[in-house]
Amino acid sequence: MKNYKAIGKIGEGTFSEVMKMQSLRDGNYYACKQMKQRFESIEQVNNLREIQALRRLNPHPNILMLHEVVFDRKSGSLALICELMDMNIYELIRGRRYPLSEKKIMHYMYQLCKSLDHIHRNGIFHRDVKPENILIKQDVLKLGDFGSCRSVYSKQPYTEYISTRWYRAPECLLTDGFYTYKMDLWSAGCVFYEIASLQPLFPGVNELDQISKIHDVIGTPAQKILTKFKQSRAMNFDFPFKKGSGIPLLTTNLSPQCLSLLHAMVAYDPDERIAAHQALQHPYFQEQRKTEKRALGSHRKAGFPEHPVAPEPLSNSCQISKEGRKQKQSLKQEEDRPKRRGPAYVMELPKLKLSGVVRLSSYSSPTLQSVLGSGTNGRVPVLRPLKCIPASKKTDPQKDLKPAPQQCRLPTIVRKGGR
């Protein structure tokens, strides 16, 4: 961390604390997520899903950009250097007397659905979508904190007590870890309501109260849904019939299209719940799609790539130090679980092969194509072999310095047979 100066503390969680840092190389400000856990080897770092996921998902305009990963083998400390955002959604709405305009709400929710569509198409689900993990910078929204993410192809059951209680889907509460990527849409629906009303939708004080709060609003589900959940839980349960007050009774300032999408996102049955790519086509986002289409047309006329990226030239650039040298490089499911085509999909996220004490710096890679989208022939991203840079090569002003630790560049994620 000798290349960064601590400016102040942003926040702290169970497993990490986040600091505002200034780079001594480029003068830019970053968010440093310092892990509280100590790591004994590169293999342990390899197994961190958060790093694997961010490497696969970056770059995307609605996913937090990972700038650098710094691992100190001697102390076992690990830090993730990410782009610095202005605030999270919780901070945005906290203390507000009046809700945001529906246009602003629509703009933010469209970007949140874009981020979820991107991660789901790339075989990952977040599992902890909540206001604190959704970051804002001016009008750009980005999903962050992938510490709880999983591969959609990994074997169930998953961890039961995942996600923050208020945003936890019924299948997470009522089964022994048998849930899918659809849980992210439930959580996003809860965030949707909270942005619009400035109040949490289901503020349960414990697990039982959480289910009760859900039933108070939505009503108890059909018996066939409860029966399906019971098959995935050792303990039996029954609930008294509740009709539910309904979401419209809790709000008066939301349009019919807004309420329609909100209901679709918090459908009790995950099989009936809307998927992210379907949400993006909902009538509520009609104006957003038109705006995006016009912007795409302008980019094509100007000769720019078809996939616009949020305009952040500084935070989207990475500087890789090699003892005095700086190199600047640009960073660039259907309703049910997607059907397999061709070779079997990977069951877990790919591991990054590293060696020695390293500073892992991101660098440009082509925009990732979906592992679930058409035209992939069922193939998944692969990793190129690592290129290691010996630390022995120094420029003249540094000959009297001690040998630096070995540095490795992370490989670009590429797809065989892709575009």
From Swiss-Prot:
Catalytic activity: L-seryl-[protein] + ATP = O-phospho-L-seryl-[protein] + ADP + H(+); L-threonyl-[protein] + ATP = O-phospho-L-threonyl-[protein] + ADP + H(+)
Catalytic residues (UniProt): D128 (proton acceptor)
Role description: Able to phosphorylate several exogenous substrates and to undergo autophosphorylation. Negatively regulates cilium length in a cAMP and mTORC1 signaling-dependent manner.
Subcellular location: Cytoplasm; Cell projection, Cilium; Nucleus
Xref: Pfam families: Pkinase
Cofactor(s) this protein requires: Mg(2+)
UniProt similarity note: Belongs to the protein kinase superfamily. CMGC Ser/Thr protein kinase family. CDC2/CDKX subfamily.
Reported tissue expression: Expressed in heart, brain, lung, kidney, and pancreas, and at very low levels in placenta, liver and skeletal muscle. Detected in retina.
GO MF assignments: ATP binding; cyclin-dependent protein serine/threonine kinase activity; metal ion binding; protein kinase activity; protein serine kinase activity; protein serine/threonine kinase activity
Native organism: Homo sapiens (Human)
Keyword terms: ATP-binding, Cell projection, Cytoplasm, Kinase, Magnesium, Metal-binding, Nucleotide-binding, Nucleus, Phosphoprotein, Serine/threonine-protein kinase, Transferase
EC number: 2.7.11.22
Record's protein name: MAPK/MAK/MRK overlapping kinase
UniProt feature, compositional bias: Basic and acidic residues: 322-338, 393-402
Gene Ontology terms: biological process: intracellular signal transduction; protein phosphorylation; signal transduction
Top EC class of this enzyme: transferase
GO terms for cellular component: ciliary base; cilium; cytoplasm; nucleus
Post-translational modification: Autophosphorylated.
Record domain Protein kinase: where: 4-285
Keyword Metal-binding: yes
